[in-house]
């Protein structure tokens, strides 16, 4: 099951809601996933989804809150996956005109009928109604990527004005959704992980948001471990390179002028470095009597490297 299906399955359990919330939710579903048809038998409206939980919710909301006994149809998709496609159909005799009027989709002005797919003003004025509307928009046209791979949540709509309205509604919850055009569709999307979690909280997908939070924590831990490993590897590489350079300098001094020409403190550490090329500066310092700190050992080895460099340039 995809993560989108999990989220939809979770939020489709919200059926014990007020009539106002149900109207907002059904309005969003209709505007995102619905098709209006005119025929000899009158008007009909069809909502299409590949998610069985979404189809059941639409059917239940219509029956429980609007006394509309819609028709539920199922057919096989033409795609390679051959998924079922669920269609909830409301005909003239089932009360489609009243529902279209209640949702603000069908309006009559001076005897002329017109379609309006904007989000009505009253939706913006109540927190619970806003949440129900966004929940409906996700049920009708939303999707979310697998959070193990990437963070991306989107709503597919077919009107630029509607997409902008939906984005504005989402952003009343201090989110930063944006709108882009993709072929003939207008996409409202969020890409930042924390914001996706916040939106899932808005629509009531609490189990799903906890799953994303756990994934985000694990990703962050893995990234931190990788950073530490990379840092340790880089430091180890620098240490090894420095030790190789020091041994080469000491061998040059030994062959050119002899170790006996070095001051006692430098000869002492030079001999230790030759005998223990893999030891750290701290470990070399602890071998001396009295012991010398890491910075003191580093200072002596730098002096040795300087002497070797002078020998190289004097050739």
Curated annotation (Swiss-Prot):
Keyword presence, Cell membrane: no
Keywords: Cell cycle, Cell division, DNA-binding
PROSITE patterns from the UniProt entry: INTEIN_ENDONUCLEASE
Superkingdom of source: Bacteria
Coiled coil: none
UniProt GO MF annotations: DNA binding; endonuclease activity
GO biological process: cell division; regulation of sporulation
InterPro entries to which the protein is assigned, alphabetical: Homing_endonucl, Intein_endonuc_central, Sporu_reg_WhiA_N_dom, Sporulation_regulator_WhiA, Sporulation_regulator_WhiA_C, WhiA_LAGLIDADG_dom
Gene3D superfamilies xref list: Homing endonucleases
Pfam families tied to this protein: HTH_WhiA, LAGLIDADG_WhiA, WhiA_N
Regions recorded as binding DNA: 280-313
Family listed: Belongs to the WhiA family.
Function, as annotated: Involved in cell division and chromosome segregation.
Protein name: Probable cell division protein WhiA
């Amino acid at each position: 099951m995809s993560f989108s299906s999990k989220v939809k399955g979770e939020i489709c359990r919200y059926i014990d809601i007020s009539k106002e919330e149900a109207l907002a939710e059904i309005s969003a579903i209709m505007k995102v996933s619905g098709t209006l048809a005119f025929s000899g038998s009158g008007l009909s409206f069809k909502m299409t989804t590949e998610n069985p939980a979404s189809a059941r919710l639409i059917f239940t909301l219509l029956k429980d809150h609007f006394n509309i006994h819609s028709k539920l149809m199922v057919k096989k998709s033409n795609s390679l996956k051959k998924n079922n496609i669920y269609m909830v159909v409301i005909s003239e005799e089932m009360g489609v005109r009243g529902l279209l009027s209640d949702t603000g989709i069908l309006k009559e002005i001076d005897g002329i009928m017109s379609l309006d797919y904007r989000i009505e003003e009253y939706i913006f004025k109540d927190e619970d109604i806003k949440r129900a509307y966004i929940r409906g928009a996700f049920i009708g046209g939303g999707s979310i990527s697998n959070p193990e791979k990437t963070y991306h949540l989107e709503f597919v709509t077919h009107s630029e004005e509607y997409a902008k309205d939906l984005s504005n509604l989402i952003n009343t919850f201090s989110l930063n959704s944006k709108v882009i055009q993709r072929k003939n569709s207008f996409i409202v999307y969020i890409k930042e992980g924390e914001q996706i979690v916040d939106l899932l909280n808005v629509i009531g997908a609490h189990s799903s948001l906890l799953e994303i939070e756990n994934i985000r924590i694990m990703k962050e831990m893995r990234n931190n471990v990788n950073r530490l490993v990379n840092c340790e590897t880089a430091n180890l590489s620098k240490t090894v390179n420095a030790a190789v350079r020091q041994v080469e300098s000491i061998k040059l001094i030994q062959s050119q002028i002899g170790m006996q020409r070095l001051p006692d403190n430098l000869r002492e550490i030079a001999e230790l470095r030759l005998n223990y090329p893999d030891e750290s500066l701290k470990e070399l310092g602890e071998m001396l009597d009295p012991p010398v700190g890491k910075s003191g050992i580093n200072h002596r080895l730098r002096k040795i490297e300087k002497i070797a460099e002078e020998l190289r340039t004097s050739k």
